[in-house]
Amino acid sequence: MKSQILKLQQTLTKKPASINPLLQQIDGAINEHWSSNFLLKNTVEWAQAQAPKNRSKSPLNNIPFVLKDNIATKGIVTTGGSRFLEDYIPPFSATVFELLNNSGALLVGKANLDEFGLGGTGLHSGFGFVHHPWNETLIPGGSSSGSAYAVARGIVPFSIGTDTGDSVRRPASICNIVGFKPTYGLISRNGVYPYAPSLDHVGIFARYVYDVALVSDEIIKHDKADFSAQKSPDAGKFTRSLKESFNKQIKIGYLKPLEEWFDIELSKKWNSLKERITLEGCELIPFHFPLELLEVIDPVYKLISYSEAVSCYSNLTGIVFGQKLFEPNQASDFSKTITANRDRFFGEQLKRRFIIGAFGTDKNNFTKYFEKAQKIRRVMVDAYLNLFKEADFIVSPSASGFTKTIAAVQKGESFTNLVDDFLQLANFAGNPSITIPWLVKQKDQTIGLSVNANCFHDKQLLQVAAWLEELFQIEHDD
């Protein structure tokens, strides 16, 4: 089973002194790719100071990684991709960063993202676009754009992102890597800037499923500091499970209505997949999931997530912390001061989404819109999770087509449909979901395969993903 982490660890074990040349090499790669805007902060110097102190027995010891810049790092600027927090240095670290730090992993950079995670293209950071790793005219997907870029270009063997609607799995699909979102609450969100707390997940990028399992063993741990934390029945056993024999006598479901949205090329690849896994001994189950539910996934997602977001960031006033146009004692009007600060330092996309969220939670609209959206979400989740009573896993393309150009997205051309929206169901339900490389037309035109399991079946999901990964045999360019 392929693993970049183990390969690198073997080199470091044989030649401990090779850590310094490795970090210098990464520093050079970061500088070479700096114009792609995938990083907001180069922390290689921090890693160089940390490496000699590491004594961990973890497979991640002295393994470099990149962290999405909405995850707090004590003493290191954490912007959330927003000009509002351009100079903000957290006095604490997120639990997920502390766990990685304790494992000996070395932070070499803070990754760019759509502002506070509210975006799916990589074009809405306060610090400029993130470009596709293999074609600067294309979008990389978002919001965890920089984290995906770093892994796709081989700069680091793994990175950490966040996934509220598909923000790990969509860029993984576009960048031809693995993106894993575990069951809700298994990776602590303590110290992670929120977008929509009922939907937010921390996720992992890597080139191979085995590396995702290695990282999962280190960061899927119950955290009392996270009120939404849940305990995994398989914590610490994910890597070990991939070495066990895999029973291919499984039931794999798919949503039949989505096939109508496939283009010719995607349909051909999809039919080939169904034939292959049937030949391998799996049972395929077509589900006629209600079309009326699929059609409202995206509006329900937007209403709930934007409403939660506007509440989460109500503390960004510029009065206590964050950027400000002038000092509070110079302000003549409190409300006007906050409005001026937000207008100046928030991006246009963020402001539009906050307006929608404020509208949905207004006292005159709450019952009509937000409360109704929550009820529809419940109906969706019940219908979706019921599928796992008949199937062990549910598969789907991770996108309806290849990624689009930056120019096309800026023009507002529609480029998603129900196939793309399907990924959001795993955030509504909180079940584990993974994207693995699958359809490769050329290195800048790829579509991943989404594999989903029932809640707390993360171990089984990684097992089937590793098996499918071996079937597909996708090669990576450095």
Swiss-Prot record:
Q: What is its EC number?
A: 6.3.5.7
Q: Give the stretches traversing the membrane.
A: none
What chemistry does it catalyse, as a reaction equation?
L-glutamyl-tRNA(Gln) + L-glutamine + ATP + H2O = L-glutaminyl-tRNA(Gln) + L-glutamate + ADP + phosphate + H(+)
Give the highest taxon in the source lineage: Bacteria
- An example molecular function term from Gene Ontology annotations: glutaminyl-tRNA synthase (glutamine-hydrolyzing) activity
Among the GO biological process terms of this entry, one is: translation
Per UniProt, the keywords (alphabetical) are: ATP-binding, Ligase, Nucleotide-binding, Protein biosynthesis
Which InterPro entries does the record match to this protein?
Answer: Amidase, Amidase_CS, Amidase_dom, AS_sf, GatA
**Pfam families reported for this sequence:** Amidase
Q: Where is the active site?
A: 68, 143, 167
Task: Spell out the GO cellular component terms annotated for this protein, sorted alphabetically and separated by semicolons.
Answer: glutamyl-tRNA(Gln) amidotransferase complex
User: So what family is this one in?
Assistant: Belongs to the amidase family. GatA subfamily.
Query: What NCBIfam families does this protein's entry cite?
Result: gatA (TIGR00132)
Q: How does it assemble?
A: Heterotrimer of A, B and C subunits.
User: What does this chain do?
Assistant: Allows the formation of correctly charged Gln-tRNA(Gln) through the transamidation of misacylated Glu-tRNA(Gln) in organisms which lack glutaminyl-tRNA synthetase. The reaction takes place in the presence of glutamine and ATP through an activated gamma-phospho-Glu-tRNA(Gln).
- What's the protein here called? Glutamyl-tRNA(Gln) amidotransferase subunit A
State the organism of origin. Answer: Mycoplasma pneumoniae (strain ATCC 29342 / M129 / Subtype 1)
